[in-house]
Amino acid sequence: MIEVLMIEDDIELAEFLSEFLLQHGIHVTNYDEPYTGISAANTQNYDLLLLDLTLPNLDGLEVCRRISKQKHIPIIISSARSDVEDKIKALDYGADDYLPKPYDPKELLARIQSLLRRSHKKEEVSEPGDANIFRVDKDSREVYMHEKKLDLTRAEYEILSLLISKKGYVFSRESIAIESESINPESSNKSIDVIIGRLRSKIEKNPKQPQYIISVRGIGYKLEY
């Protein structure tokens, strides 16, 4: 599922857009306070940012500038401010598109899909040759590393395939437990850590200095390669 970060202080609008986009396979996480939105952008991995400009405590143009300096993420400005100078500054600060309010949510959906298509094409051109280190066979519930089958328990398969499904995305321990069928959702964080440790022993050259399964302090884990 596509993950969109929204920074919008109009809660009613945010809820309306979130419900509409979810019907089209796009999950939206909204923050109505810009500093928490910036923190989320820097600690989580999203496919796209939908950003309002008129925000409390910090102007959206500055939010755009800060996030685009720290993260490579497509940005759509969604704002009632239609001044040409705002549009120019937003694009200069890293925005990819500018959609003046009010607008039809179907137009927003079309712009999101178009921007993500362009973004993915760029990734395909620049993706290094090691992009296919891992391969998941969902029918046989097996994971291959460099085309060699890994000997995994059911829980190990579920966690590793989850991490592979969204490379670079930070999964909390709680979400890992919820998404893994064989793990009790109420399992302790320690239980998840133990399984991660076993996985590292099977895929890492040096489990104590992992290069694939990376710990994100205070949150959980992500897969990088």
Swiss-Prot record:
GO molecular function term, any single one: DNA-binding transcription repressor activity
Name of a matching Pfam family: Trans_reg_C
Result when mutating D52N: Significant decrease in levels of UreA, UreI and UreE expression in a pH independent manner. Significant increase in biofilm formation
One GO term of the biological process aspect: positive regulation of DNA-templated transcription
UniProt keyword terms in alphabetical order: DNA-binding, Phosphoprotein, Transcription, Transcription regulation, Two-component regulatory system
Listed SMART domains: REC, Trans_reg_C
DNA-binding region: 123-225
Signal peptide: none
One Gene Ontology CC term in the entry: cytosol
Reported modifications of this chain: Phosphorylated on Asp-52 by ArsS.
CDD domains: trans_reg_C (cd00383)
Residue positions, PTM 4-aspartylphosphate: D52
Domain (Response regulatory) ranges: 3-116
Keyword Transcription regulation attached: yes
Job description of the protein: Member of the two-component regulatory system ArsS/ArsR that regulates genes involved in biofilm formation and acid adaptation by acting on major ammonia-producing pathways. Upon phosphorylation by ArsS, functions as a transcription regulator by direct binding to promoter regions of target genes including ureA, amiE and amiF to positively regulate their expression in response to acidic pH. Negatively autoregulates its expression.
Protein name (record): Transcriptional regulatory protein ArsR
Organism of origin: Helicobacter pylori (strain ATCC 700392 / 26695) (Campylobacter pylori)
Record gene name: arsR
